[in-house]
């Protein structure tokens, strides 16, 4: 019996584990090369000598490279995908456009996810050299600088308030954020959020003076939570966390599937909803380690989860 176990380790488990790790390493090396290519393109795109057509070509190349990165996430060993945890029979990304697929997603953020972004208004895009040679009348270009939190997706169907109710476009609802005070006590604060359909709609509100310093704006088309200056400062000072609960219908080919990153529910079929848990009730990640027994009382974890790579 002991000899048969040793043979199993030597002839089957160890070669399988080695092949799985080798496939993962190959995919990661490919991604490293692609990221290097992306950096090269970005550096080249910063040149002042480039024309508009050149930059559009670079943008097309960057979009292609982005797709290549996520296609590596679908790498498999013997037909089993290596970055998808226990769901080795499933792809990491959507393989085709799925306009009717709908998810409810709970995406958690910390204060460290807040980043500064500049928004511009009154821009004019000159498409050709002929247009550039002509006199073009423009409105004054304005710049707005705000901190923001970006969702994993754009084209959001609806954002939920702290009670799980949809915040309608043009309306203001309340989200909750959580932090620990100086005594170690858990605290909860409120953040008022107004929902806008597009970035242009939000810019109109900003120009009208309707962007409160202690509030936020949510832009559905881009999936951005834009923070007022005071609101951002409060979240940072308290080292707060915030969870955004939203629905999204329609996913493009190449987009990552939400279940590998977030707690979410596939609500495409209202009568047969499918719930996925990435984190437990305490916010701890639920790991899906695939272990091979390679010797007596020795196991080796062979898989890497997509959320640790992408």
Language model: regions and residue ranges:
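Short flexible/disordered coil segments
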Residues: 44-54, 107-121, 154-170, 179, ...
């Amino acid at each position: 019996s002991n000899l048969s176990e040793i043979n199993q380790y030597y002839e089957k488990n160890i070669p399988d584990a080695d092949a799985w790790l080798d496939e993962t390493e190959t995919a990661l090396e490919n991604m490293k090369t692609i990221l290097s290519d992306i950096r090269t393109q970005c550096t080249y795109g910063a040149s002042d000598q480039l024309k508009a057509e050149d930059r559009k070509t670079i943008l097309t190349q960057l979009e292609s490279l982005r797709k290549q990165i996520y296609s590596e996430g679908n790498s498999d060993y013997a037909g089993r995908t290596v970055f998808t945890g226990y769901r080795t029979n499933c792809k990491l990304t959507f393989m085709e456009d799925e306009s009717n697929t709908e998810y409810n997603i709970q995406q958690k953020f910390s204060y460290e996810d807040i980043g500064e972004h500049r928004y511009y208004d009154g821009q004019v895009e000159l498409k050709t050299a002929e247009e550039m040679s002509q006199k073009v009348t423009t409105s004054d270009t304005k710049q707005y600088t705000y901190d923001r939190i970006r969702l994993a997706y754009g084209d959001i169907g609806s954002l939920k308030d702290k009670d799980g109710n949809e915040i309608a476009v043009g309306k203001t609802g309340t989200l909750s954020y959580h932090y620990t005070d100086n005594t170690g006590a858990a605290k909860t604060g409120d953040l008022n959020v107004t929902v806008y359909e597009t970035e242009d709609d939000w810019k109109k509100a900003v120009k009208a003076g309707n962007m409160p310093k202690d509030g936020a704006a949510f832009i559905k088309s881009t999936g951005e939570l834009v923070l007022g200056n005071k609101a951002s400062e409060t979240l940072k000072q308290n080292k707060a966390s915030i969870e955004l609960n939203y629905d999204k219908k329609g996913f493009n080919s190449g987009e990552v599937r939400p279940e590998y990153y977030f707690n979410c529910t596939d609500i495409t079929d209202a009568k047969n909803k499918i719930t996925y848990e990435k984190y437990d009730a305490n916010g701890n990640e639920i790991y899906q380690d695939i272990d091979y027994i390679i010797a007596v009382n020795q196991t080796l974890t062979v898989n890497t989860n997509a959320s640790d790579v992408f």
